[in-house]
Amino acid sequence: MLNIFSLMYICLNSALYSSSFLFAKLPEAYAFLNPIVDVMPVIPVLFFLLAFVWQAAVSFR
């Protein structure tokens, strides 16, 4: 039980510290990549949804 709370504490702390990265700007040399960087967090969600579509295609075996 203690391990679960420790893991939750670590996750919350890392989320709080990494939230400052959400507002960071890319260097000017990479400014043309801004649209791609904005879409990148959505990509894992698309793979998650693809798993359901794939399972529906094979009738949830």
Curated annotation (Swiss-Prot):
InterPro entries xref list: PSII_PsbK, PSII_PsbK_sf
Keyword annotations of the record: Chloroplast, Membrane, Photosynthesis, Photosystem II, Plastid, Reaction center, Thylakoid, Transmembrane, Transmembrane helix
An annotated GO BP: photosynthesis
Localization per Swiss-Prot or TrEMBL: Plastid, Chloroplast thylakoid membrane
SUPFAM superfamilies: Photosystem II reaction center protein K, PsbK
Pfam families referenced in this protein's UniProt entry, alphabetically: PsbK (PF02533)
The keyword Plastid is assigned to this record: yes
GO cellular component: chloroplast thylakoid membrane; photosystem II reaction center
Highest taxon in the source lineage: Eukaryota
Propiece residues: 1-24
Biological role: One of the components of the core complex of photosystem II (PSII). PSII is a light-driven water:plastoquinone oxidoreductase that uses light energy to abstract electrons from H(2)O, generating O(2) and a proton gradient subsequently used for ATP formation. It consists of a core antenna complex that captures photons, and an electron transfer chain that converts photonic excitation into a charge separation.
Family the UniProt entry places it in: Belongs to the PsbK family.
Subunit structure: PSII is composed of 1 copy each of membrane proteins PsbA, PsbB, PsbC, PsbD, PsbE, PsbF, PsbH, PsbI, PsbJ, PsbK, PsbL, PsbM, PsbT, PsbX, PsbY, PsbZ, Psb30/Ycf12, at least 3 peripheral proteins of the oxygen-evolving complex and a large number of cofactors. It forms dimeric complexes.
Protein name: Photosystem II reaction center protein K
Organism this protein belongs to: Citrus sinensis (Sweet orange)
